[in-house]
From Swiss-Prot:
MF terms (GO), sorted A to Z: aminopeptidase activity; metal ion binding; metalloexopeptidase activity; phosphoric triester hydrolase activity; proline dipeptidase activity
Example GO biological process: proteolysis
Residue positions binding Mn(2+) 1: 255, 335, 380, 419
Name under which the protein is recorded: Xaa-Pro dipeptidase
C-alpha cells in the first residue's frame, strides 16, 4: 500500500491542477462533486445497488457510500463531506482512515438533507457534477454538469496517472485469478451458474462489486455478445466456453475475455488463429496511431481467417469492403478503460469535446482517438456465428461467398472473443492481462 500511497500524492496533485485550470478558464469558484444517492425500487423499500459517480471516485476510493460530496477548487485542500448517519437498520460506513485521508479536510454529514450547512455559503458560482440535478437545483446550483467542464475532464481522464495505472494492474491481477478458476471449472464440467460462482469466489468480489455483469457463455450462447443469463443446467454436449469478466480495485476496472474449446478441433484452431491476430494487433499500438486504423486492420485479419478456415470465398479486402466481415465481427475492437468499463473520452478530439465520429461502416466502434502515452484500452477482436447477421448476407449476392456448411459446423460453438487490457507507453505497450499470468 505504501507504493500506492506514493503515487496517490502525485495523482491528487494532477487532479487539483486540472480543476484549477478549468475553473479559472470558466470563471467558476470550484466544483462540487456528488457521490450520488440511493435509488429505490418501484413500490418497494429496497434500493438498487449503489454505484458512485465516477467523477467522485476519481478522487478517492469511497465506492459504496451515497450522499457524500467533494468540494474542490484546485487551490485549497479538497473537502470531503462524508455521510455517516445515525442508523440502526443498516451498516454505517466507518470514518475513513486510509493513506488518502491526509489529502482531505473531512466533515461528517449525519442527515443527507442537511448538506447545505456544510457546502460553501454562496453556491451560485460553483458547478455541480453529478446525477441528481433536482437536488442540485434545490441547493441553488445554477451551473449543473456544464458541458465545458465535463468535456475537459473527460478528455483528460483518458490520460491515466501512475496511481491509476497501478490500480488497473491490480484489477487485472485479481481478474486473472478469476479467469484461471473459471477455466478450470469449465474443463471440470461446471454449469454457467457454477462457473460464475467459482469466478466470484476466486476474485473475492460479489455481483455488485465486479465492474460489469460477467458473461459466462457455454456453446452457442457465446454468439450473444452481452449474454448474462447464467444457465443452471449443463448443455447435453460441452463444446466451448466464452468468459468476459473483470474485477475492480479502488474503483478502477479490468475487462478481460477468453474463449476455450473443450476438445481439439477446427474451433480450437480458430481460437489459436484469433489469439495470434490479437497479439499482432497489440504490437501495432503506439503513440500517434489512430485507433480506427487498428479496428480496420482487425477486419483484414478476420477476413483472412474467414478464407483460411473456409468460411468464405473471395479476397480479403473484398470481404471487408462488402461488409461480410462485419457480419462475423460486428462490434468494435475495444474501448477506453478506467473508472468505467467503457470509459469516457473515447471520441474526444480535444478539451472542448469536439467529437470524432466512428466510421460510417463501423458504427459500434467505441474509440476514435489517436493513441497517446498512459492511455489504457481493451483489445478484443472476435468472430461469431450470429444467425440474425448472417441471414442478411443470404438476402443478396454476398451469401454466395459464404460456405454455409462450415457455418453450420461452427454454429454450436457460438463464437470467439479474446480481450486484453493494454497500457500505451511512449516506447512500448504493457499488456497487463498477459504479463500478470493469463495466457
Amino acid at each position: 500500500m505504501d507504493h500506492l500511497a506514493h503515487h496517490y500524492h502525485a495523482h491528487i496533485a494532477e487532479l487539483n491542477r486540472r480543476v484549477a485550470e478549468i475553473v479559472s478558464r470558466e470563471a467558476l469558484s470550484g466544483l462540487v462533486i456528488h457521490s450520488g444517492q440511493p435509488h429505490r425500487m418501484f413500490l418497494d423499500d429496497i434500493n438498487y445497488p449503489f454505484k458512485a459517480n465516477p467523477h467522485f471516485k476519481a478522487w478517492l476510493p469511497v465506492l459504496d457510500n451515497p450522499n457524500c460530496w467533494l468540494v474542490v477548487n484546485g487551490r485549497d485542500k479538497p473537502q470531503l463531506i462524508f455521510y455517516r448517519p445515525v442508523d440502526f437498520w443498516h451498516k454505517v460506513s466507518d470514518v475513513p482512515e486510509m493513506f488518502w485521508t491526509e489529502h482531505f479536510e473531512i466533515k461528517l454529514l449525519t442527515k443527507a438533507d442537511k448538506v447545505a450547512e456544510l457546502l460553501p455559503s454562496d453556491i451560485t458560482n460553483w458547478a455541480y457534477l453529478g446525477e441528481h440535478l433536482d437536488v442540485a437545483e434545490v441547493l441553488g446550483f445554477t451551473s449543473r454538469n456544464p458541458d465545458s467542464v465535463m468535456s475537459y475532464l473527460h478528455f483528460h481522464r483518458t490520460t491515466k496517472t501512475e496511481y491509476e495505472l497501478e490500480c488497473m494492474r491490480r484489477a487485472n491481477q485479481i481478474a486473472v485469478q478469476g479467469h484461471l478458476a473459471a477455466k478450470n471449472a469449465f474443463y471440470n464440467g461446471a454449469s454457467e451458474f457454477e462457473i460464475q460462482q467459482q469466478y466470484l469466489s476466486a476474485v473475492g468480489q460479489g455481483d455488485n462489486e465486479v465492474p460489469y455483469g460477467n458473461i459466462i457463455a457455454l456453446n452457442q450462447n457465446a454468439a450473444i455478445l452481452h449474454y448474462t443469463a447464467l444457465e443452471h443446467q449443463n448443455p447435453a454436449r460441452r463444446l466451448s466456453f466464452l468468459i468476459d469478466a473483470g474485477a475492480s480495485y479502488f474503483g478502477y476496472a479490468s475487462d478481460i475475455t477468453r474463449t476455450y474449446a473443450f476438445e481439439k478441433n477446427r474451433f480450437d484452431e480458430l481460437i489459436t488463429a484469433m489469439n495470434k491476430a490479437q497479439l499482432e494487433l497489440i504490437d501495432m499500438m503506439r503513440p500517434g496511431v489512430r485507433y480506427p486504423d487498428l479496428h480496420l486492420a482487425t477486419h483484414g485479419k478476420v477476413a483472412q481467417m474467414l478464407l483460411d478456415f473456409e468460411l468464405a470465398t473471395g479476397d480479403a479486402q473484398g470481404l471487408v469492403d462488402q461488409g461480410i466481415t462485419s457480419a462475423f465481427f460486428p462490434h468494435g475492437l475495444g474501448h477506453m478503460l478506467g473508472l468505467q468499463v467503457h470509459d469516457v473520452g473515447g471520441f474526444s478530439f480535444d478539451e472542448r469535446g469536439t467529437h470524432i465520429p466512428a466510421p460510417e461502416a463501423h458504427p459500434f466502434l467505441r474509440c476514435t482517438r489517436i493513441l497517446a502515452p498512459n492511455q489504457v484500452l481493451t483489445m478484443e477482436p472476435g468472430l461469431y456465428i450470429i444467425d440474425t447477421l448472417l441471414n442478411e448476407l443470404k438476402q443478396d449476392s454476398r451469401g454466395q461467398q459464404i460456405n454455409w456448411r462450415t457455418v453450420d459446423e461452427l454454429r454450436p460453438f457460438g463464437g470467439i472473443r479474446i480481450e486484453d487490457n493494454v497500457i500505451v507507453h511512449q516506447d512500448r505497450n504493457e499488456n497487463m492481462t498477459r504479463e500478470l499470468g493469463l495466457a
